[in-house]
Amino acid sequence: MIERLTDEDIIKTALARIAELIDAHGEWLYAQGASGSVCLRKSECDFRVSHRRLHFSCWTHQGLVIWRINGWEWTGEKLLLEASRRMGSEKARLELIPRASARAAAAAINDSRRERCYRLANLACAALRGAKVERASLSAGARSNQPGRYARILLRHLNRERIAVAGMVAGAGSHDTDAFLSSALIWFMRLRERSARPPYIRKLWLVVEKDYAEALAQTLALLREDLRHVITLLQLDDEWQELTPVRSPELEELWAQQPERFRRPPRDFMSESAEGIIALAPEAIDVVRARHGETLRYHGLAFARVRRLMDRESVWFGIEGARRRLLDETTQEEWSKLLRDLKEHRSAQAADQHHALYRASPEAWLEAELRRDITRLDPGLRLAPLHAQFRPTHVGSGSRPIDLLALRRDGRLVVIELKVSEDREHVLQGADYWRRTEIYRRHGHITRSRLFGDAPLSDEPPLVYLVAPLLRFHRSFAQLARAIAPQIEMYRFDINEDWRAGVRVMRRVTLTNNWH
């Protein structure tokens, strides 16, 4: 049973117990949802208490990850961690598995997911009279030796048609609906292409638990009409005994919904401390404002924070995951060393491109480059104001921040979604950000909040720019782009691979006109 970390004594006890467990095994497998697993030495598993909270950090293929631990459990075979980050907007269940027992754990997980897959197959078959299960298996895992997270089922109905059924059979996080839908759409479209003989595969059923049904229904509204009409969304009850159809709204119905409370960005004010720090390296350092202060970033990597309390400014410094120190006379040497390290290693000209500071937060680095001169991407965009990591709802709502929200000179809003590595969810994330932005635009929140000052906004939906290095678009990008409704005007921007040295657009493709 998960033990909640609710006070300092419980946190200290948990830290001591976790430290004992980690020290007892030389190597661990770190797993987070569908992102695969990473092998860690015990010295690479960093648990520490900071600001009366327990934090865990380690290096993965995506760079340094830091989580706040809200609860933990040792099952006897693995360490379960309930974690969150980004002010609680992203939540996950992490697993640390001793390397020696990883193979046995993988086999047990595989058996459990297969059993769930067969249960889903029987439920789906029972929901349609005359149907038979033709095939039931798991999707491919993140790696060859890992079990898949989704059920892949084919039903044959009275020899007239075949129905593809996809379902979640593994624990999901708050943002996993895009991953599930992307995977299901790719599988379904490939099945249809290969279905050369009758009975043909014409329908797709999506089976999810209650917590994900509403979010998935909203996303389905963003698909092109002919695809939506062959998709049925089914909700599982808590006991996995019954399937209930869930209606997906039409695209126009989304605009009638009352949006969540709009969160205005903080005022455009810079403290003297922030100004002084930026002056140390104005070509590399920028500031991101929050309600309770400012975050200073070196090419997108947060390294200092300014807080104002009782009319006094305080500066705390340190890379995320490391212990933060108050900047004063006693820490000047550490502060200077941090700045020297950033200058040496977080640079396009860095000699060691495997250094932790070079590899950390690559998407934030790209975002920082574009914030400095957004016209590198599109000369028609207003250089300022430009809203980075724009989150229109409260941080605890579970909504992800939009990478960049800009304004074209003709008054059209532009949602910019950045990736620096292959990401299957790129297209659906861009479409979802379009939906959220359009709801707030139609209700007048963006105009009333004066996000772009006195600049007039045109009465048109936003554009979506999907940006990634030339060779870093997912191989299924084109398939998923074809699935999006034509009302969502999307563009693909291929930028140079060496974007750290300066962003250049290598190719721009109008997706909407190409696919529809």
List each language-model region with its residue ranges.
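Charged, terminal alpha-helix-loop-beta segments
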Residues: 1-516
